[in-house]
């Protein structure tokens, strides 16, 4: 990777964004023999994946990190790049906090009162059945799309959830998957997301689900390896794209320090960021509406570092879900050899928005207090602490991914993927399988590259 000195360049294809989607697209294009340039606003590759050093050559993943079963695209890419995965630590009992009480349980569902537990099971089966009726390539064509897209998940819960326990568990599932509150999300979007993963259990589970495995050396290595394979001069860092002039003849992509002319462009950044680029001629109103309405989730990913994972000695897995918060979900995020010990906690939705206004030291105190509550006094005194407020990131504006509020799928969803002239769209938000996940990002890049190759012949 180099920061080129030229003020202008030409290529067959220009890719905007050097995250997983953009680099996967560029890799596929290079493999097919196309000349490609990738423009990245940040001073690094990886997008919403980022490795954070914690000493002794070890890292923690401060962005997206997990892969799981059925995520064939990203798991295949990991293998192709010579990387390995290791299982998330799940051995031991988990903690569930509600109403000031800490309960311990094994498996995926907390031990709560039988009536509430039975309702949770019934609701999960019902949501899976509803999701099965949503075509992932066109959610707006679901038989009940208009009805489901006219309400929030919160309003659906109000009508269909009877026990407080079930309501609390469903809310934790929602903020844990989308980093948004139930009131923020269209019911249709929730159902689409479940369908794109296969089931709500695949979305929420560790063992056997989306949180099953991690990448040895950190998930950013996937992007770093792809960028290395592309070779010098292909990826231009610190090059935020400001405008795209497009016609049937090609595109001219203008950044702060470089202008690239090409036959085709792949815009591989979240819709909310793609909407901040100036297009000439202007994009259709339905596409503008999509960019304006598809918000990013709100999350602060926090990690406390300890000399050893002492909770394992007490028979605890490190996994926690808390109704009380502000840390709502936590995991053991230690390196493969278990040293040092690392506890991961998420501040999500409303809690994240409140925490982003605080200093890192203040967030450290908040997270340490939560961990002390969950795991005892030793957890309240980490030797190090790292976090990332993704909503404050200029070139992310939130994580984990974009989500649709009521009305957006039925009004604007059809504009999400189709090319507009010589501009193609990629990114985790455009995926039909594992939307919003690293797997979805990789598959979207491959799909956009195939579109371009078909167009340029």
Feature roles, as predicted:
Residues 135-239, 247-248, 268, 278, ...:
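Active-site/ligand-binding neighborhood in enzyme catalytic cores
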Residues 2-8, 12, 23-24, 32, ...:
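Conserved flavin/dinucleotide-binding core of flavoenzymes
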Residues 58-130:
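Dinucleotide-binding Rossmann-like beta1-alpha1 core, especially the glycine-rich loop
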Residues 75-96, 164-171, 310-318, 322, ...:
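A short alpha-helix-loop-beta-strand transition element characteristic
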Residues 267-285:
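Flavin (primarily FAD) binding-site architecture
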Residues 14-16, 39, 241, 259-272, ...:
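Short hydrophobic core segments
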Residues 245-260:
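Conserved beta-strand-loop-beta-strand element in the redox core of flavoprotein oxidoreductases
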Residues 30-55:
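Glycine-rich FAD pyrophosphate-binding loop
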């Amino acid at each position: 990777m180099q920061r080129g000195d030229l003020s202008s360049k030409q290529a067959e294809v220009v890719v905007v964004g050097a995250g997983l989607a953009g680099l996967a697209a560029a890799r596929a294009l290079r493999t097919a023999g196309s000349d490609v340039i990738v423009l990245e606003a940040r001073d690094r590759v990886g997008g919403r994946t980022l490795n954070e050093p914690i000493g002794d050559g070890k890292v923690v993943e401060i962005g997206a990190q997990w892969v799981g079963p059925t995520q064939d695209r990203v798991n295949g890419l990991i293998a192709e790049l010579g990387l390995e995965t290791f299982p998330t630590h799940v051995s031991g009992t988990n903690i569930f906090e509600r109403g000031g009480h800490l309960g311990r349980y094994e498996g995926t569902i907390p031990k709560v009162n039988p009536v509430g537990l039975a309702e949770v099971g019934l609701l999960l089966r019902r949501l899976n059945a509803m999701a099965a009726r949503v075509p992932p390539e066109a959610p707006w064509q679901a038989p009940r799309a208009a009805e489901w897209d006219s309400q929030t998940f919160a309003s659906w819960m109000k009508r269909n959830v009877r026990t407080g326990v079930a309501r609390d568990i469903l809310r934790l599932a929602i903020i844990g998957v989308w980093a948004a509150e139930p009131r923020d999300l269209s019911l249709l979007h929730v159902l689409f997301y479940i369908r794109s993963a296969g089931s709500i259990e695949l979305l929420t589970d560790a063992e056997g689900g989306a949180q099953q495995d991690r990448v040895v050396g950190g998930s950013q290595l996937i992007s770093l390896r792809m960028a290395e394979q592309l070779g010098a001069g292909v990826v231009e860092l610190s090059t935020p794209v400001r405008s795209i002039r497009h016609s049937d003849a090609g595109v001219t992509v203008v950044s702060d320090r470089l202008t690239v002319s090409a036959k085709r462009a792949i815009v591989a950044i979240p819709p909310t960021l793609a909407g901040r680029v100036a297009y000439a001629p202007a994009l259709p109103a339905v596409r503008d509406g999509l960019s304006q309405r598809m918000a990013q989730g709100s999350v602060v990913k926090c990690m406390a570092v300890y000399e050893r994972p002492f909770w394992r000695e007490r028979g605890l897995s490190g996994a926690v879900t808390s109704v009380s918060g502000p840390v709502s979900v936590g995991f053991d995020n230690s390196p493969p050899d278990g040293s040092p010990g690392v506890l991961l906690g998420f501040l999500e939705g409303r809690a994240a928005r409140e925490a982003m206004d605080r200093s890192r030291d203040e967030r450290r105190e908040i997270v340490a207090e939560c961990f002390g509550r969950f795991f005892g006094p030793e957890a309240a005194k980490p030797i190090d602490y790292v976090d990332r407020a993704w909503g404050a990131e200029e070139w992310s504006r939130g994580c984990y991914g974009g989500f649709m509020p009521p009305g957006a799928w039925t009004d604007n969803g059809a504009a999400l993927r189709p090319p507009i002239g010589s501009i193609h769209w990629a990114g985790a938000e455009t995926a039909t399988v594992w939307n919003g996940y690293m797997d979805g990002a990789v598959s979207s890049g491959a799909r956009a590259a195939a579109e371009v190759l078909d167009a340029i012949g």
